[in-house]
Amino acid sequence: MTNIKIFWHVNELGGWNHVMDQQWDLINSTGLRNAVNEINVCMNGQPWTFVNWLQSKNTDDSEGKIKLVNVNKDAAYHEWPTLMYMLQQAREATEPFHICYIHLKGLLRYGDPNVGDWRDFMNWATLEKWRDNVAALDSGAEAVGTNYNTVPWPHFAGNFWWARSEYVAKLEPIAHPEDRMNHSFTQFTRHPTNPHWRFDHEAWLHSKNPKYVELARSLEPGERHYRERYPRTNYDFVL
């Protein structure tokens, strides 16, 4: 069986602990924790915040799966530090592994029930349905996710996904946030409604045209999730 490594981008924006608790519970209750080889908690903030969080769980990690990785202290870098740490790990690996990538979706709009529904949907497809993601990768897919769109670039809306490390290792690095002259400079085609460089993080995975599987689909385009509710009853029967 191919090794599995979770890369979990976490930061200290308001509501972080509630979202992190939710995802942690799913990682444990679905059996994913037992299946993975590593859970890389990629800390984008003060390390002691997440050290204290992990200690509060009183979890037995005798196998040493949980790795607290201090990728950066500035949440303004968004997902860049974790994605670049993942790229480094993929390139340095001596054998291939499957990547599960998640983050604390929706903290900038924490408390918005619409965004909470979107996060719940992606948690369901990425964490609860982890076996389906692994099966797709084992069958030849290089990337698996939800809500595949091609505008303004190919991407999985929301940016939760699984991928093969061999494919990720071929991706080009994303430009460092400090290299940006201003927020409207982007490495990929500008997002039509928000030209901020953080959308490069969503465009990155598909920049080398992977063989992909769309595991599930919800509201289209993804921005509708900011305006509409999407309860679990809309999708729990899909797979």
Predicted segments, located by residue:
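ER/Golgi luminal nucleotide-sugar-dependent glycosyltransferases, focusing on the catalytic module
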Residues: 1-239
